[in-house]
Amino acid sequence: MTTSHMNGHVTEESDSEVKNVDLASPEEHQKHREMAVDCPGDLGTRMMPIRRSAQLERIRQQQEDMRRRREEEGKKQELDLNSSMRLKKLAQIPPKTGIDNPMFDTEEGIVLESPHYAVKILEIEDLFSSLKHIQHTLVDSQSQEDISLLLQLVQNKDFQNAFKIHNAITVHMNKASPPFPLISNAQDLAQEVQTVLKPVHHKEGQELTALLNTPHIQALLLAHDKVAEQEMQLEPITDERVYESIGQYGGETVKIVRIEKARDIPLGATVRNEMDSVIISRIVKGGAAEKSGLLHEGDEVLEINGIEIRGKDVNEVFDLLSDMHGTLTFVLIPSQQIKPPPAKETVIHVKAHFDYDPSDDPYVPCRELGLSFQKGDILHVISQEDPNWWQAYREGDEDNQPLAGLVPGKSFQQQREAMKQTIEEDKEPEKSGKLWCAKKNKKKRKKVLYNANKNDDYDNEEILTYEEMSLYHQPANRKRPIILIGPQNCGQNELRQRLMNKEKDRFASAVPHTTRSRRDQEVAGRDYHFVSRQAFEADIAAGKFIEHGEFEKNLYGTSIDSVRQVINSGKICLLSLRTQSLKTLRNSDLKPYIIFIAPPSQERLRALLAKEGKNPKPEELREIIEKTREMEQNNGHYFDTAIVNSDLDKAYQELLRLINKLDTEPQWVPSTWLR
């Protein structure tokens, strides 16, 4: 596939550092846009023209109105003619009817031509009338002088002759080109249809079989295939023709490259326009160009199969290469850039922490190659040669995606997100107060029980892009702890308790620590680990607690060692934690599997809580939904998966399925866990 670049996204040429983002206008990016040609599926599209100005649109609309009036007058005259007695009698004769074939569907993109849809030609009288109309509309003296000058030009004989030539060329250029055959094996298809219809006993099927067996139809299909083979077969480019054509490029170093390209394999190269030249700007992994190793970035394309390329824009290159296959002969001027031999790149696997849609990104070099993904998707990055735009495949799409797609590089994405945040902060109006002083935020902070060491403010301001991942299969004797996260009243505590009650030999809870005194019938090490306040505070300072807090002047907390004890016993540790504890837990060596329990819709949540005898207010339900969005936005990068709890029994079965899958399938985990 040959595609095109938009070069406005960088201003520096160094590969060793992040390149600056050029926030140019869409029109500027349109000038540098690269075109994707020979793309799989519907990716390749022609570059859209820049919109006309409003004044030109108004003039065009006036011309359309005049043309429409003439058509209406013509139709009126036609109706007058149709009212004659002879035509009325002819109209009473029943028309010939055929058999309606509901299975027939015109090929997408084929337009049935009709004189009614012919290109409208602007006549000199229309132009003169439009100028007269504009002359009456515009009142300033400068415009009147301009219109008078144009009217004199329109009345000039030389201009009118040139205008007629223009119209004649327009009519010729808009003539439909002869259709290109879609296939050259119509006979084989007819035989296949007959095979399919053999067991069919319907009347229509038998009629179709008989029709396909008639000598006339078989002769027609044979003739079709012969003509199609001639049309679809590219004329071989001989060495003599190539050497003869490159003689015109005397004085320039020229190389000849031949690439075999199958019909179902895209070429996999991107091109851009530099003045009159067509330059290869990117080699895409997975295409015929990359596999051949013969095309390189910076090469100028002079000819393809004997057709001169210099002077063509990327749209014309798109049209030229869209149907080419077989042997492609390129005449190139090699790139003058001296690049070190490419090092063998290793594939890295990353988890995306943001959503990306290339159709909304004005800086993507080639929109047709942009790879869309959602937060949480796994991407297999196979090339980071361009630090700004990586080439990657999305997990699960490798077989259906012949070419690697373009995704923003990590540093590039961080840079433009930082720029976006700066712009948004600058736009925020300052809160005004008395005497031009800013008001203080008097909203009280609600106390929560969580580990406050290693302040989470950095997490909130960190720009999340990608996280490198590796596959990990948990050992049979060392199960990963299961962490349930979710807003209140969403069922995570109920799900945890049900697992504990139904499979006591498989699941266990970490024994918490406390500074309060032991009560009657409580067993140390089973109900709590009873420690002194001094020892508890020392463990807090040492970062040994996943989460902790104070209640009635006593400290409570869950330690990393308590979770590790459950893991070492061979059981699965079940925890229900607050989101503030996830950073400490994830930075430990416990390798947690974090499941987000999300609420259903507001109405469904109300019904579920009503079954439990709860009657929440509408604002309480809205608060739960809003809290869910907040948790997903701020902590979603920690979650391994999510369960929507619309039914507690179904949610329990899904939770059990996910836990069981950890024993049978490897899971993606941060690569730092395995180093």
From Swiss-Prot:
GO terms for cellular component: adherens junction; apical junction complex; apical plasma membrane; axon; bicellular tight junction; cytoplasm; endoplasmic reticulum-Golgi intermediate compartment membrane; extracellular exosome. Residues 21-140 are annotated as: Interaction with PARD6B. Residues 479-660 form the Guanylate kinase-like domain. Residues 256-336 form the PDZ domain. PROSITE patterns: GUANYLATE_KINASE_1 (PS00856), GUANYLATE_KINASE_2 (PS50052), L27 (PS51022), PDZ (PS50106), SH3 (PS50002). Belongs to the MAGUK family. This is Protein PALS1. It comes from Homo sapiens. The lineage of its organism: Eukaryota, Metazoa, Chordata, Craniata, Vertebrata.
